[in-house]
Amino acid sequence: MGKVTFNMTMSLDGFVAGPNDNPDNGLGDGGQGLFNWYFNGDTEVFISEGTPPLKVSKQSAELMKESFSTLGAGIWGRKTFDIAHAWGGHPPGSPAFIVTHNIPQEWVKEGSPFTFVTDGVESAIHQAKKVAGDKDVVICTPSILQQAIKAGLVDEIYVDLAPILIGGGVSMFDHLGIGPVELECIQVTQTPDVIHLAYRVIKK
């Protein structure tokens, strides 16, 4: 059975986007610098069909390729789905499960890469794990992560720590609503533009 993981880029002060993030301002005010590491390297990595490759460091490329090789399904929230404009129908993790209260009917069709889940995060994780089989399910939205941690369903957390202070916006770990969650550091990879951190969630 694969693992349930979380992976996002975060600023040094804990934000994954600046204030006022929306479909016309995807990373929010001041958030663009989070992803400089996507373009400052010399190794190409393709993350989804129909999009140009990223150019990252060799170390980052190796980690990303390893991550994609074990990816069985992805989970996002509806806000992320809308901000990304549905990734043009090519999400960077397919099949893609979208947790939402309102299903966008234009994407309910044969061949759609999206499964819309209206009965909560735990249901989305259960469905994604069933599809992923022996591969991993990756969560890519902070609010989904927070709910999944509360439910004790997250096995590992991967943070790409960007060298920037945003000062406000979308916090990765807001609203946990529980006591301390102990983590075990399992990997640290330092590059000139980003530090990749990996933690195992210690479950009690």
Task: Report each predicted region and the residues it spans.
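Enzymes that bind and transform nitrogen-containing heteroaromatic metabolites
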Residues: 1-204
